[in-house]
């Protein structure tokens, strides 16, 4: 049983992938909460409840924005590590999501300093549905990746 750089990459990826799974689950829960608050706060009769709901929506979007850069940077780190370890199959599996993250990062609104998840935009039914589907797809990808990294870590530790 030899400890190689590839085994280290898989171990670190396994731990960080657990964090990405947590991020994806948090996104799903947040979008589900936004879906329950889908009615426009202006439509409500009581202005106190409307302001309270609007603050809740802004708080959720603020927290979602805080998770975007760590998620993108962790996934970029995966790709750099697997490139350095010359794990081509694993790199090939991660590159499509990395390109999607780059596309998403560079196509955010130019006038906002935040990355995404602006409250009025997210509360659009189509955007909210898209974001929720994206979160479910990322959760599936990260779960499959987790078990793939676990298998590859064991394989590299045993085969070396």
From Swiss-Prot:
Membrane-spanning intervals of the chain: 11-31, 73-93, 139-159
Tissue-by-tissue expression: Brain. Expressed in the neocortex, hippocampal formation, and cerebellum (at protein level).
Cytoplasmic side: 1-10, 94-138
Pfam families in UniProt: Cornichon
InterPro entries tied to this protein: Cornichon, Cornichon_conserved
Molecular function GO labels: channel regulator activity; signaling receptor binding
One GO term (biological process): regulation of membrane potential
Broad class of where this protein is predominantly found: membrane
PROSITE patterns for the chain: CORNICHON
GO cellular component, one term: glutamatergic synapse
Compartment(s) where it occurs, according to its Swiss-Prot or TrEMBL record: Postsynaptic cell membrane
Source taxon at top rank: Eukaryota
Keywords: Cell membrane, Membrane, Postsynaptic cell membrane, Synapse, Transmembrane, Transmembrane helix
Residue ranges annotated as Lumenal topological domain: 32-72, 160
Membrane topology: Multi-pass membrane protein
Binding partners and assembly: Acts as an auxiliary subunit for AMPA-selective glutamate receptors (AMPARs). Found in a complex with GRIA1, GRIA2, GRIA3, GRIA4, CNIH2, CACNG2, CACNG3, CACNG4, CACNG5, CACNG7 and CACNG8.
Function in brief: Regulates the trafficking and gating properties of AMPA-selective glutamate receptors (AMPARs). Promotes their targeting to the cell membrane and synapses and modulates their gating properties by regulating their rates of activation, deactivation and desensitization.
Record-stated family: Belongs to the cornichon family.
Protein name: Protein cornichon homolog 3
Gene responsible for this protein: Cnih3
């Amino acid at each position: 049983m030899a400890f190689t750089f590839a085994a280290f990459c898989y171990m670190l990826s396994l731990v960080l992938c657990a964090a990405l799974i947590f991020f994806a689950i948090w996104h799903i829960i947040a979008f589900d909460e936004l879906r329950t608050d889908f009615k426009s706060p202006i439509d409500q009769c009581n202005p106190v409840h409307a302001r309270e709901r609007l603050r809740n929506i802004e708080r959720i979007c603020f927290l979602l924005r805080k998770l975007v850069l760590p998620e993108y940077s962790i996934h970029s780190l995966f790709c750099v590590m697997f490139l350095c370890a010359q794990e081509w199959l694993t790199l090939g599996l991660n590159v499509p999501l990395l390109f999607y993250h780059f596309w998403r990062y560079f196509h955010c609104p130019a006038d906002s300093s935040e990355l995404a998840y602006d409250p009025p935009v997210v509360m659009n039914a189509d955007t909210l549905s898209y974001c929720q589907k994206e979160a479910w797809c990322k959760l599936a990808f990260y779960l499959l990746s987790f078990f793939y990294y676990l298998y590859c870590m064991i394989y590299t530790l045993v085969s070396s």
